Amino acid sequence: MSKNLYKIAKAKKIKYFLISFVDLFGVLRSKLVPTRAIKEMQTNGAGFAGFAAWLDMSPADSDMFAIPDPNSLIQLPWNKEVGWLASDLWMDGKPVDASPRIMLKKQIKSLQNEGLIMKSGVECEYFLISSDGSTIADTKDTQSKPCYDQSSLMRRYELIKEICDCMIEMGWNPYHCLLYTSDAADETVR
């Protein structure tokens, strides 16, 4: 039996759900759904126009529906009123082949059929930049090779600690935090 998201929301005081999927460019797409509507969304899915989310579709295609996976529920540590859900995309009664999650599931199944196990994970990387996006956030970071620099790391300690604490609370089990600084133009070349 599937988990009842409405009951879970009431027990955990979740007011909204982010029903989410990833497009072909790796952008997370979502709809914010109030808890009162989650029962219907859990059954029928949240409607999206696939062409508007960079999936291989046109405006003439039917809407697709993101059916949330209750086992993926993460109550956001920085906003406990919100529960995040991964979803599977369906259109016209069939899985959407252009969905990265569907592609991954197919690959996992294919490998299992060959007696293999796929292991995957997330490397959480992010950039700390100024509010206007013009410079790195730490203007004291002037080293040519700043990776692993303790002074730089500790100047950003409060923010890095908050991010790491949230990952721990979500059950992601991070095992270290480090600081690596690089020019964004250099990163696009690598």
Feature names for model-found ranges:
Residues 1-176:
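ATP/Mg2+-dependent ligation/transfer catalytic cores
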Residues 180-190:
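Single conserved hydrophobic/aromatic residue that forms the stacking wall/gate
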